[in-house]
């Protein structure tokens, strides 16, 4: 087998959202990087919905931007509708979401990656890992040659032994129209990796000209919403479009109920578990039998195509049943299908063999990111890609790994969850997964994480200075307003007390007291308002974190023998040996580990220290 005459620092397998972020970040840190993809025309392809962000997910994209990644930038360039979700709810759960042009997203990402120094993008299909039994050495390809690298990042998406289901029909594929990867699964098994099966699905695509939008509710976008942190107002570069909302009918329910046995999911042909919070339409009908109808969202796939995505109508039914189901939906009576819905099963690796840095515990220098780790979603994948790419370079440079904590980021929450919990379904980020979500708002991601991005060499000095200036402005203005007393109603109070009132906004305060309130602009002003309005809650959460950190970050030796600690419960010995947590905090979050077990472990660590 011929070996390519370059020894790379980092080889990234797969150019989906995880792979693109990993390759970009590794190259930006100065590494020589190979990004290997089976098809250059599908780089950063949005395989399912044409959207980025949402609750929890939008927070992650903002964190990626704060660290110096690229998903936010590509989303803003490709966005054809921007919205803030949960506007009427508290600031912790408000999140940006964008409809994007699928083709432009791919084009912008590929063009950007092609311009990064040190990054070589190559078409080829990874067939097997090269290793010496302890350390990864590179990758061999289906085409018959090999690439050598000091580290390898595996971001295979749904391609590992991917199996597509449409009713009773099933066939191999990584997604509809693309071949599955068969060799990598076998190779990981050879190396001792425990594999499981998960399932996801995607709805049919329809021709917009065949849809009756007049009976649907129009859903326009919002103004000044974006993913890249800015000081100024954001004006989209592309024309903006609306989505539309419709619903299923009694006929839809009857059709699905009568044909349930023909569904790949309910017919017993799918062994993988699907995402709980993105169920197929047949799953909704069965699990929510008391509901007469379900919302369906019609989302445009781009500006230069008539295809639309039917959000909420994912299914693994046969095509003839899909046809009838779609035409039973209000406004879709004459809909023309351009692509069928399907479900897909794929292999993933259990989290107990992965460090929070996303390096494998079994083969040194091998990093895993994206759906191979059991997650679902472009955003979760991209965040893991950033972490894997950064830590692959840290490995080469012999620097300590970068692992943000769950107290300071949603990315940290995800890394901790993936490596301490047993997944029984695809992992999706929600704000409810974070214990301190009021501290992890989407508006303050830059102030929380930009110092990491700058120190890693991913975030420019100019952007870092912007974040530092924002942070300083907010702190200074909070201090000044707390010492500025004015009459409000019948009493004289500091202006911070006025802004704490639920009916008073920062803009109202600025209008009412123009001589006393500094105009920080709408972006920084909104963050200032949240910091002041929720200062009591924020202070309590910060106090709680400080008290927890004393035990949270106590290190556990890598060579500890849990089976020798007889006071631990049998379940604790088994679980701790399986997951090998690095800190007491991580150990405490493993399912089945009790407070008593943690106390025993801490006593044992103190004895060993003495």
UniProtKB/Swiss-Prot annotation:
Annotated NAD(+) binding sites: 274-288
Gene3D superfamilies, per the entry: FAD/NAD(P)-binding domain, GidA associated domain, C-terminal subdomain, tRNA uridine 5-carboxymethylaminomethyl modification enzyme MnmG/GidA
The UniProt record lists the keyword NAD: yes
A GO molecular-function descriptor: flavin adenine dinucleotide binding
Subcellular localization: Cytoplasm
Cellular-component GO terms for this entry: cytosol
Record keyword NADP present: no
InterPro entries recorded: FAD/NAD-bd_sf, GIDA_C_N, MnmG, MnmG-rel, MnmG-rel_CS, MnmG_C, MnmG_C_subdom, MnmG_C_subdom_sf
Main location: cytoplasm
Positions with a binding annotation for FAD: 14-19
Keywords tagged on the record: Cytoplasm, FAD, Flavoprotein, NAD, tRNA processing
Biological process terms in GO annotation: tRNA methylation; tRNA wobble uridine modification
Cofactor(s) required, per the database record: FAD
HAMAP family: MnmG_GidA (MF_00129)
Similarity-based family: Belongs to the MnmG family.
Quaternary structure annotation from Swiss-Prot or TrEMBL: Homodimer. Heterotetramer of two MnmE and two MnmG subunits.
PANTHER family (UniProt xref): GLUCOSE INHIBITED DIVISION PROTEIN A, PROTEIN MTO1 HOMOLOG, MITOCHONDRIAL
Purpose: NAD-binding protein involved in the addition of a carboxymethylaminomethyl (cmnm) group at the wobble position (U34) of certain tRNAs, forming tRNA-cmnm(5)s(2)U34.
The protein, known as: tRNA uridine 5-carboxymethylaminomethyl modification enzyme MnmG
Organism: Chlamydia trachomatis serovar A (strain ATCC VR-571B / DSM 19440 / HAR-13)
Organism taxonomic ancestry: Bacteria, Pseudomonadati, Chlamydiota, Chlamydiia, Chlamydiales
Gene behind the chain: mnmG
């Amino acid at each position: 087998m011929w070996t390519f005459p370059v020894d790379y620092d980092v080889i990234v397998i797969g150019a989906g959202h995880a792979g693109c972020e990993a390759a970009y970040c590794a190259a930006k840190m100065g590494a020589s990087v190979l990004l290997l993809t089976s098809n250059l025309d599908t780089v950063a392809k949005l395989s399912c919905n044409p959207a980025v962000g949402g609750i929890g997910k939008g927070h992650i994209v903002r964190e990626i931007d704060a660290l110096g990644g690229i998903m936010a930038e590509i989303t803003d360039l490709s966005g054809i509708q921007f919205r803030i979700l949960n506007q009427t709810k508290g600031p912790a759960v408000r999140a940006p979401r964008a409809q994007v042009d699928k083709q432009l997203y791919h084009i912008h990402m590929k063009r950007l990656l092609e311009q990064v120094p040190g990054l070589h993008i190559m078409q080829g299909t990874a067939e097997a890992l090269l290793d010496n039994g302890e350390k990864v050495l590179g990758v061999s390809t289906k085409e018959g040659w090999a690439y050598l690298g000091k580290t390898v990042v595996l971001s295979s998406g749904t391609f590992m032994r991917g199996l597509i289901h449409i009713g009773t029909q099933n066939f191999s594929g990584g997604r509809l129209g693309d071949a599955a990867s068969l060799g990598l699964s076998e190779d990981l098994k050879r190396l001792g990796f425990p594999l499981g099966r998960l399932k996801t699905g995607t709805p049919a695509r329809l021709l917009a000209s065949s849809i009756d939008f007049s009976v649907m509710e129009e859903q326009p976008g919002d103004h000044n919403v974006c993913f890249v942190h800015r000081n100024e107002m954001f004006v989209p570069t592309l024309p903006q479009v609306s989505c539309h909302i419709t619903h299923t009918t009694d006929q839809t329910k009857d059709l699905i109920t009568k044909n349930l046995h023909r569904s790949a999911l309910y017919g017993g042909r799918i062994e993988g578990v699907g995402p709980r919070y993105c169920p197929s339409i047949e799953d909704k009908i069965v699990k929510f039998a008391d509901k007469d109808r379900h919302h369906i969202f019609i989302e445009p796939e781009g500006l230069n195509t008539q295809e639309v995505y039917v959000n909420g109508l994912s299914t693994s039914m046969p095509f003839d049943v899909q046809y009838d189901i779609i035409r039973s939906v209000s406004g879709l009576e004459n809909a023309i299908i351009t692509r069928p819905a399907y479900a897909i099963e794929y292999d993933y690796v259990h989290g107990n063999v992965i460090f929070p840095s996303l390096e494998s515990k079994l083969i040194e220098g091998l990093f895993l990111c994206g759906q191979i780790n059991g997650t679902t979603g472009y955003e979760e994948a991209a965040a893991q890609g950033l972490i894997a790419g950064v830590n692959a370079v840290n490995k080469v440079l012999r620097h300590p790994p970068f692992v943000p904590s769950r107290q300071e980021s949603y990315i940290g929450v995800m890394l901790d969850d993936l490596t301490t919990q047993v997944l029984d379904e695809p992992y999706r980020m929600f704000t409810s997964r974070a214990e301190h979500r009021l501290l992890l708002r989407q508006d303050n991601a830059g102030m929380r994480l930009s110092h990491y991005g700058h120190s890693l060499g991913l975030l420019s000095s100019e952007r870092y200075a912007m974040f530092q200036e924002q942070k300083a402005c907010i702190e200074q203005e909070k201090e000044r307003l707390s010492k500025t007393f004015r009459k409000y109603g019948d009493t004289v109070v500091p202006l911070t007390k006025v802004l704490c009132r639920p009916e008073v906004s920062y803009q109202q305060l600025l209008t009412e007291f123009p001589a006393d309130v500094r105009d920080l602009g709408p972006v920084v002003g909104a963050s200032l308002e949240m910091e002041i309005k929720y200062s009591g809650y924020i202070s309590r959460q910060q106090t709680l974190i400080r008290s927890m950190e004393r035990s949270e970050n106590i290190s556990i030796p890598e060579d500890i023998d849990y089976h020798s600690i007889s006071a631990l419960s049998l379940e604790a010995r088994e679980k701790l040996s399986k997951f090998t947590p690095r800190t007491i905090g991580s150990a405490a979050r493993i399912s089945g580990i009790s407070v008593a077990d943690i106390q025993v472990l801490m006593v044992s660590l103190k004895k060993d220290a003495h």
